[in-house]
Structures are given as structure tokens and as C-alpha cells.
Amino acid sequence: MAATGNEEQTLLPDIEEEAEGMEREMESEDDEEEGMGVEHSEEEDEEDTSEDERENEAEIQRLEEQLSINAFDYNCHVDLIKLLRQEGKLHRLRKARQKMSELFPLTEEIWLDWLKDEIRITEDESDREKVYELFERAIKDYVCPEIWLEYVQYSIGGMGAQGGIERVRSIFERALTAVGLHMTKGASIWEAYREFEIVILSTVQPPPGTVPSQEQQELLSAQLERIHTLFRRQLAVPLMDMEGTYAEYSDWADDGVPETVTHQYRRALQQMEKGKPYEEALLVSEPPKLAEYQSYIDFEIKEGDPARVQIIFERALAENCLVPDLWIKYTTYLDRQLKIKDLVLSAHERAVRNCPWTMGLWKSYLLALERHGADHQTVKDVFEKALNAGFIQATDYVEIWQSYLDYLRRRVDFSKEWSRELDELRAAFSRSLEYLKQDVEERFSESGDLSCTLMQIWARIEALHCKNMQKARELWDSIMTKGNAKYANMWLEYYNLERSYGDAAHCRKALHRAVQCTSDYPEHVCDVLLNFERVEGSLEDWDAAVQKTETKLNRVCEQRARVAEKEALHARQEEEKAEQRRKVKADKKAQKKGQKANRTGDKRKAEDDDEEEWGEEAELPSKRLRGEDDFDSTVTEELMETESGLFGRRAPPARKTEPPGFRKNQQGAPEPQRQPHDMPKEQRKDENCVFVSNLTFNMEDPEGKLRTLFQGCGTIQQVRPVFTAKGTFRGYCYVQFEDRLAVPEALKMDRQEVDGRPMYVSPCVDKNKNPDFKVFKYKTSMEKHKIFISGLPYSATKETLEDLCKEHGTIRAIRIVTNRSGKSKGLAYVEFEDEAQASQAVLKMDGTMLENFTLSVAISNPPGRRMKDEAAPSRFLGAAMPRQLQGARGKGRTQISLLPRSLYRQSTPDAKAENGTISAPHATVTDGETSLDTQTKSLSNEDFARMLLKK
């Protein structure tokens, strides 16, 4: 210690001179900045009333007002800080940064800007201490080599103060511990440390030609040993450009590099070569590089060096701070492997600051606090913060309450009849039930604890530890009144509690109530009651139990028989409807074949045969169900000419003007005109073909245009556009490839805009051969990694949404919902890399404004789509009738119904509504006749006659 003091006294004059020189340089820079500031302030005074300043001030006030409403708006904080820094409002800028740092961990860029601004205005030693405190806060958020390098460089500027050199060395050592193992950036800290010590060495060396004293020689030897030690330590760490460091040490060391150092260097070099592929993968990949970091982490865990595992985790989290799974993996590793209190608790605290919506991180934090002996108030404060974190599921609140109650239970000494900890535990149980009932149900419309898990545990604690069966029974009575009395497992749980800690009378009472109320597994409950009476009961108890169970089981059998009868009736009705549909379809097919036989000419016949084989009419219904797009209610005349039953039966053939290109043969029939590239039917393969639809009807040369569009997918055998008899393009076609491998590439062009409309591309499948084939490619269930945005301006584009959402995470896909004409509906789906990013986007974007439109953002959970047979019933019987009533061109024929008007009305005035409609009996049409299907039987002509006579 004395040597250290003498060293500082010897070095102080030289250090003070260097410090004074640095201060003079800083003062000159400050003078220049002040001069620039004066000129700038004069310009500001001259342009004080400029429009830009007024706009900026108005924007600042708007941002501050928005933050007063929602303090957790991250983007608003960033915009406010950027604007205040631009305007040079230092006092307000400092307050804005301080407020943001209290709510969020700050990024490396924000911290560096803040630190540089504070360093620039530092004037005296007290201000330097404030900057030191700011650095200490900055290094706690993330492990950033740049911030550590800025920290050590700033500390060098204060080494002239009392104890300054030791302070600099202390900060350097902490920096090496934090980032010295960083394979690509750690070398900068090592080199800065060595350069600092070499500068110190130059100050302790005696002037040339003088004989150093013993004290000077000791100082010189100690300083040389420090530099040797730094070289040896660095060469033992796998870092990039190790060869250069080794060569530098070889030149610097007078006696050469020791063998032990060379051995450590070679071993570190081998380790560096193992990790080099992972570093190169990180170098060439795009942020946030999560997959590459995951591979790197797995490699380091397999290698088994805890320090290197820690640094790679920290590097990954610096770029993926909003990935809860990565934080969970890191904290779990620290809990199970390192178990260092300060390191573990710091990681848990940073985890919940970055991902506060993740319940699992809060739960792990509470366990870590208890594991490392944190005081009760600290655990309680962390739990209260967790309740205000804003979880996305009701069950998350149940789990965090469960973890906290477990902690409180472990604090209680149940050997005492009364304790303050026991009262606190009971109060916490009561508060948890109240919290779930009020706060959670108000937000999620459910408590999240349908099985009353918390109450069950409370009852078991009262029975087991407190010997208070009366309280346990009260709790179970409350559990059963919350809709759990029909479940056998709930009654058996209560029975087991009474069996363990109660008496036989209450066991018998519980089982009798269970037999009376259970509806899911009554046989099991009855068996438990009979077995109980075999062991515990008298003859009278046995007779009562047998009578009760027989009565219950007989009633259950009757109920099941009625249900089975209803199901059988429903199955028969469905089978009859299916048979009727098959019959109607067969009649239509026969009628269609008859129409074909009566047609004159071979050309029309060939065209119809081609269309039937390619399955175009079978494809159209599936295309109608694509995407979230609604089908236009007004169907164009061209689409209504389809020959299948999609939009109605084809109208009877009428005389038509023959389109251009038709010429009759000697018998008067038109000659067929095959397309130039049309191929025989037997050569067509559906697996090599795609169906293209929703094209504009006035497309010129559709074959040539589509051939150009799809030529990049593979070699095209044929493009077959479909035309009406008049020669009008129907808006859909088939593209046949030579190789089936081209089909997936063609399907990727689905929804591509062509002539202002989204082009639909789907597999070519014959629905007659594959009736269950579904074209709808988007999920109709909840997708937690995808968000649904409504309320968008119709002018919003994919680029607009990408700019809006990219700051919340990695975007995988953006889909704007459009109608068939390609116009936006103001709805969009944005798919993120993971659930955490989507949840963060919902929290940050919901309720924000875009071009004066208020956005509504939620997790994607589209409603299930109804199939044809599941369509909601209409208000009137006519709406449920087959489409043959509308004819080939919609409602071209008369709409007069021959059904009596009294039967055409709704069945009952109080019929239940479903999705905005009222159920009514189904009407069916067979061969032009309408009949009414009721739940009892169909009405005959005699029934209609009797009904008319009653009037």
C-alpha cells in the first residue's frame, strides 16, 4: 500500500501536466463550441418566430401530452428525445431521458448520445461524479463494449485526481470482466488497458543517463510486470486477431515469450478457430440474428465455459431484447449453473424490464429472490410490479398469484397456533380471489381459474396445516357454487380431503351430493359411494346408497337414450338431405347431357367437353372462399354464365348470334376451332396445372399475357383461357406446365396484382374427384405471432405498414385485405417472428393514429368460415331454397313463389336468432315443386287442403 502511495505521488506531477494539457484542449474545444453556440443562438434569435420552430414546439407539446396519457409509449419517448436534442433544449431533454430510463432499458445508441451530451457540458468535479453515476446506470441495461470503452476513456480524463489511477484500473478490470471475452470487440478494451499502462510506464522511467533509485526501480519493475501480465491474460483469451497481439508481445518482451504463455496462446487460438464459423455467420446475417445466436449459444454450452456462455447470451440479448424465450433460457442457465446472487438477480431484473408481459419471467424472478434470501419487502414489491405488468392472458394472473402464495406459505411456521405470517397468507388468499373476480374478469371476461385452483389449495392448507376443516368446507361449498358441481373429479377431490382430514359423516354427505349433481361421470361417483359404504356404512346406509345410485343411473340411461334417439334422427335427416342433393345433381347432369346432345355443331360440344374435363366449374366454388375477401354481392353477367350449379342452373339454350370465327359445315353445324396450342385430353395432368382467376374480363390477349407472367416458373405447355359462347373472356384460365415442380413456383404468384386486380392462383383440382379439397390457405384459428390491424386508411400500402411495425420486431409477412377488384378494405395482417414481438406490437400500436385514422390492433383470431352446408339460415324459406329458383342469370325469371303466403312467414315470432338471422323450416325444390321440411314430417297435398279449409 505504501508503494502504491509513493507511486502516485511520484506520478502526480507528470499526470497533472498531461491532465492540464487535456483540459486546455477540452477548453479550446468548448470555446469553439461556445463560439458556435453564440452564433447559432444569434441566428435562433433572428429566426425565433420561424415556422419550423413553431412546428417543432407544437410537436414537442403534443408528444409530452401523449406521454402524460400513456407513459409506456416507447416510440413517443424516442421521438420526443430526438426532437428535444435537435432543438437543443438540454434541461427538458435530460428530464425526458430520465423518465424513459425509469420505464424502459435504453439502447446503446440512446445511452451513448446521452453520455456524450452530459460529458460535453461537464464543468467541475461534482459534474464528473454525476457522469460516473450515469455510466454506472448505462452498463446495467445491456452488455455493450462501446459504452465500456467510452467509460474507461472518460475515466482516464480524471486520473489526475486523488486516487484517479486506481479508479481507472478498477474500471478497466470491470470492463474486462464484462466484455473482455467478446471475440470480436473485446480486444479494444485489452488494447486500451495496455496503452494506458504503457503511458504510465513512460512516466516512471528515469531520464536517460541517470541512475534510478531503489524506489524508482521497484516502481519500474512493478509497472513492467503489469504490462507483461496484461499480455499474458489477453493471449489466454480466444479473440480475433490474436496473431497480431502475439507478434506485438514478441517484439515488446526483451526475453521473448515464455513457453507457458505460448502454450496458452495456442490453446486459445484453437478455441477461437472453433468459434470462428459462428462469428462469421453473425457477420453476414441480418439483425436480429436470433437463429445464429441460438446456434452459438448451444455450441458454448456444449463447450462448458460459464464465462463464455454468459458473454454470448449477453450479446444475443443486446440484439434480441424482446424475445422472452431467450431471457428464460439465460436466467434458467444462471439459476442452475452459476448461482451467483448479484449476477442472477441482475439478469432477472433486466429480463422483466425488457419483457414485462411475460409471466414466466416474473415467476422465475420471485423464485430467484426467495432462493437468494431477499427480504420480504423486496419480494412483495416485485410481485406488485408483476400485477401491473399487463399480462395477455387471464391464466397468467392465476399463475403469478400461485407463485406468490407458495412463497408466503413457505414463510409460515405452522407449529404455532397463530403468527403474523399466517394472517398475511390468509389475507393474500382473500385478496387473490377478489382480484381475479374484479380486475381480471373485468379485463378478460373470465377469471382464468375455472377449476378454482387457488381455493382448493387454500382449503387443503387449512385442513392439513391449520386443522380447520370448517374453513375448508366453506371454501369447497363456494367452489361448487361456481359451476363445478357437475364434475365428478371436483367432488372426488373434496371427498379425498374429507377422507384424509374430516370424518365419515361428511364423507358420506359429500358422496351423496356428488351422485345427485354429477353429470359427466356418474358411474364412477356411484362406485365410490358404494365402496365407501362397504367399508364404513351400516345396512341402512348401504340400502340408501344402492337406492340412490340406481335412481341416478336409471335417469342417466334415459337421458342418454333420448340423446341417442335425437342423434339418430338427425343422422337420418342428414342422410336424406344428402341423398336428395345427389338426386338433384344427377338430374342436373342428365339435363345437361341432354342439352349437349341437342346442340348443333361440333365446336360448342368440344368446348363443353374440355371445360368439364378440366374441372373449371368445380374450381369456382373453392375460389369463392379464398382469403378474408368478401365476394361481391353483385355478380357480373359474364360470371353468371357458368354452366355448373354455382350461381344457378344454366338457362335453356336460346338462339344466339354466332361469334366471329364460326363457320358452318355442309350439315349446318359450326366447325370446331381448337386453340393453336391445345393438347389432347389424355395428355392433360392436373398435378402439372394451376387455376388462375379473378382476372379482368376485358384483358387483351389473355393467353399471351399469362404466358409472359408465368414463364419464370417453368416451361409452359399450354395456357388455356376460358371464353363464353360470345367470345368474351370469363376472367379465368388454366396454365399447364411440363413439370409439376413449376406448380409451387406458380402458386407463389397468388394475389399478385394484374391490371389493378389481385390475381388468384390455386392448384387445379377436379372437385368431382376430390370433393373435400380446400383452397382456403389462411388459418381461421388464433395465431399468436400474427396481429390483425383494422381502421387503416384505404391508401395504406405494405411499405406503410412495414415502416409502422418494423420497430416492434422482425416482420415475416404483411397482407392487406382487399376485395376482388384489388381495393383495400382497411384491414391487414402482419406476421412477426414470434409471439413476443406480436404481443409487443399490440401493446404499443393499439389505439395509435395513422393519417387521422385510429388503428385497432389485436392478436389474429379470425372467425371460423362456414361451409356451404353450414350456411346460416335465412329469414325466409325462399332464402334456403336451392339456387335453381334464380335461373342462369340471377333473378332474371319471375320471383313469384307458389308457396302459400301463410307458410312463407317465419315459423314463430320468438324464434331464436343466430348471426342476425332467424331459423325457419327448410324448403327444398325437386323438379320445380316446392315442399316444406319440418321437424315432424313433410306436408302432403291433403295437408295443404285441410289448412286452406280451416281458413
Swiss-Prot record:
Signal sequence annotation: none
Stretches forming HAT repeats: 88-120, 126-157, 163-199, 222-255, 304-336, 339-371, 374-410, 467-500
InterPro entries given in the database record: HAT (IPR003107), Nucleotide-bd_a/b_plait_sf (IPR012677), RBD_domain_sf (IPR035979), RRM_dom (IPR000504), SART3_RRM1 (IPR034217), SART3_RRM2 (IPR034218), Suf (IPR008847), TPR-like_helical_dom_sf (IPR011990)
Main location as per UniProt: nucleus
Any one GO molecular function term: U6 snRNA binding
Keywords: Coiled coil, Cytoplasm, mRNA processing, mRNA splicing, Nucleus, Repeat, RNA-binding
Residues annotated as domain RRM: 688-766, 785-862
Keyword Repeat found: yes
Coiled-coil regions listed in the entry: 533-593
GO biological process: exocrine pancreas development; hematopoietic stem cell homeostasis; lymphocyte differentiation; mRNA splicing, via spliceosome; nucleosome assembly; regulation of hematopoietic stem cell proliferation; regulation of intrinsic apoptotic signaling pathway by p53 class mediator; spliceosomal complex assembly
Compositionally biased intervals (Basic residues): 582-596
Changes seen on gene knockout: The egy mutant embryos that lack detectable sart3 expression display microcephaly, microphthalmia and die by 7 to 8 dpf. Pharyngeal arch formation is defective resulting in a thymus devoid of lymphocytes and exocrine pancreas development is also impaired.
PROSITE patterns in alphabetical order: RRM (PS50102)
A GO term from the CC aspect: cytoplasm
Subcellular localization, as worded in the UniProt entry: Nucleus, Nucleoplasm; Nucleus, Cajal body; Nucleus speckle; Cytoplasm
Bias type Acidic residues, positions: 14-56, 608-619
Keyword RNA-binding: yes
Function: U6 snRNP-binding protein that functions as a recycling factor of the splicing machinery. Promotes the initial reassembly of U4 and U6 snRNPs following their ejection from the spliceosome during its maturation. May also function as a substrate targeting factor for deubiquitinases and mediate the deubiquitination of components of the spliceosome and histones.
Name of this protein: Spliceosome associated factor 3, U4/U6 recycling protein
Gene: sart3
